[in-house]
């Protein structure tokens, strides 16, 4: 049984030594459990609510996933052939009414237009109190984009090992769903690149002029902001990597674990 704190420390050291990526202030699972105490205050709301305070459904192979996400993806699977799914906007009025019904516990997704469900799904991620790809990893993820293709992919997947387990479960489930959408791109015109363009700003919750980099990074002149407009290609490419390698999320290379054990034994 590996000591999770030791694994995390080794990952941070490995990222810094081999890729020049420094990660600071990453919050662990225990810190995120504070959201559970808010469950009683939230009531039945779905939007703007932390994952841990939402109703969950057990999904084989993925674990416990927010029930709304499961219901939305299941409903959209029936319309996966729809051209422009996620790209075409639904009715603003219908979307607002649909969101209100969902927040009041009404099971209405099965009868809603697919474009409305798709719009609601994007809004769900966009309104999370914290982005599913946490802000304290944004700088490191952006730094990884400067690496060569193979090294970049390895670095991004190693960074995924710093995510909380429940976050990884949701990402694996959702990225597998998006993969299924992309497999029908001959009909829906939504390949993995198009999906990455659409979901990157929702998963990262980035916006123009939003979120300053650390003062350390500013001094080095690496980047001044994490604005969506300026770094759109980087964010889209990063989401594309996660989409293509969703099965490998939070799976630490065994060779790295052996190095961890050797380091522990030599202490």
Swiss-Prot record:
GO CC annotation terms, alphabetical: cytosol; mitochondrial matrix
GO annotation, biological process: cerebral cortex development; glutamine catabolic process; negative regulation of mitochondrial membrane permeability; regulation of small GTPase mediated signal transduction; signal transduction
Gene3D superfamilies per the UniProt record, alphabetical: Rho GTPase activation protein
InterPro entries xrefs: ARHGAP11A/B, Rho_GTPase_activation_prot, RhoGAP_dom
Places the protein is found: Mitochondrion matrix
Domain Rho-GAP: 49-250
UniProt keyword annotation of Mitochondrion present: yes
Subunit structure: Interacts with ADP:ATP translocase components SLC25A4/ANT1 and SLC25A5/ANT2.
Function: Hominin-specific protein that promotes development and evolutionary expansion of the brain neocortex. Able to promote amplification of basal progenitors in the subventricular zone, producing more neurons during fetal corticogenesis, thereby playing a key role in neocortex expansion.
Record protein name field: Inactive Rho GTPase-activating protein 11B
Originating organism: Homo sapiens (Human)
């Amino acid at each position: 049984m590996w000591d999770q704190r030791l694994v995390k420390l080794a990952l941070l050291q490995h990222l810094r030594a081999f890729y020049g990526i420094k990660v600071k202030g990453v919050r662990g699972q225990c810190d995120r459990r504070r959201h559970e105490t808010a469950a009683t205050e939230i009531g039945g709301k779905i939007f703007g609510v932390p994952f841990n305070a939402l109703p969950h459904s057990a999904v084989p192979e993925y674990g416990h996933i927010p029930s709304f996400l499961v219901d939305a993806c299941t409903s959209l699977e029936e319309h996966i052939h729809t051209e422009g799914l996620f790209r075409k906007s639904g009715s603003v009025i219908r979307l607002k009414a649909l969101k209100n019904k969902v927040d009041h516990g009404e099971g209405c997704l099965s009868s809603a237009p697919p474009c409305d469900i798709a719009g609601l799904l994007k809004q769900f991620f966009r309104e999370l109190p914290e982005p599913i790809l946490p802000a304290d990893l944004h700088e490191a993820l952006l730094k990884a984009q400067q690496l060569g293709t193979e090294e970049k992919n390895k670095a991004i997947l190693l960074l995924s090992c710093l995510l909380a387990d429940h976050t990884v479960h949701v990402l694996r489930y959702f990225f597998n769903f998006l993969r299924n959408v992309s497999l029908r791109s001959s009909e829906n015109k939504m390949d993995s690149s198009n999906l990455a363009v659409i979901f990157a700003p929702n998963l990262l919750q980035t916006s123009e002029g939003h979120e300053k980099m650390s003062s350390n990074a500013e001094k080095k002149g690496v980047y001044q902001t994490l604005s969506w407009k300026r770094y759109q290609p980087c964010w889209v490419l990063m989401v594309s990597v996660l989409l293509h390698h969703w099965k490998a999320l939070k799976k630490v290379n065994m060779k790295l674990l052996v190095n961890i054990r050797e380091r522990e034994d030599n202490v």
